[in-house]
Design a protein with these regions (language model features):
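Extracytoplasmic/secreted envelope proteins and their assembly/folding machinery
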Residues: 36-43, 66-70, 83, 100, ...
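C-terminal cap of thioredoxin/glutaredoxin-like
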Residues: 109-181
Length: 181
């Protein structure tokens, strides 16, 4: 149902810290889009003992664009606000998010981000370096598909190992309880 991450370079939280749960995802992944409402309900049930975050999947340079969009939104402080609209832009509206003008318009329409601010963040060194760091983390965690959940940097759970994406959250709950002890 889950796999232990053997890498010695995986980040491990200290005793007493909240249990860290990361979703490895991609805005381009239809399974991630379909899973997102269930994950949102799961997040709402969590206590202060769980620290949830997202990590965009970067398996190769072709995946950089969507990770760059994610980190641009994060740097601008509109990540949560744009999360669902980005999924919908890609999977429902079928917008070409590779077109910076289309992307700038989306950021402005959905989050009030001015085009100049969007472009400055999108081109920022900090955004590009976060994409590279994400690529390294995905490799360290041994992720080969999305969505995948990482618990405390120690355990990897995917829909494949758990049996389904919904079952993946049940396994995550088990691992969170195990790590909280």
């Amino acid at each position: 149902h889950y796999q232990r991450i053997d890498s010695v370079t995986a980040e491990r939280p200290k005793a007493g810290d909240p249990v860290e749960v990361q979703e490895i995802f991609s805005y381009g992944c239809i399974h991630c889009y379909s899973f997102d409402p269930e994950l949102s309900r799961w997040q709402q049930r969590q206590t202060e003992g769980v620290a949830f975050s997202r990590l965009p999947a970067v398996f190769s340079p072709e995946w950089d664009l969507l990770a760059r969009i994610f980190y641009t939104a994060e740097v601008l402080g509109v990540g949560a606000q744009l999360h669902e609209p980005l999924f919908e832009a890609i999977h429902v509206q079928r917008l070409n998010v590779g077109d910076e003008t289309v992307l700038a318009r989306l950021f402005e329409d959905e989050a009030g981000v001015k085009e100049d601010d969007f472009r400055a963040a999108y081109e920022a060194f900090s955004v590009r370096s976060r994409v590279l760091k994400a690529r390294g983390k995905v490799r360290t965690y041994g992720v080969t598909g999305v969505p995948t959940m990482i618990v405390n940097g120690k355990y990897r759970v995917s829909g494949r190992t758990a049996g389904s994406n919904v079952a993946m959250l049940e396994v995550v709950d088990f691992l969170v309880a195990k790590e909280a002890q």
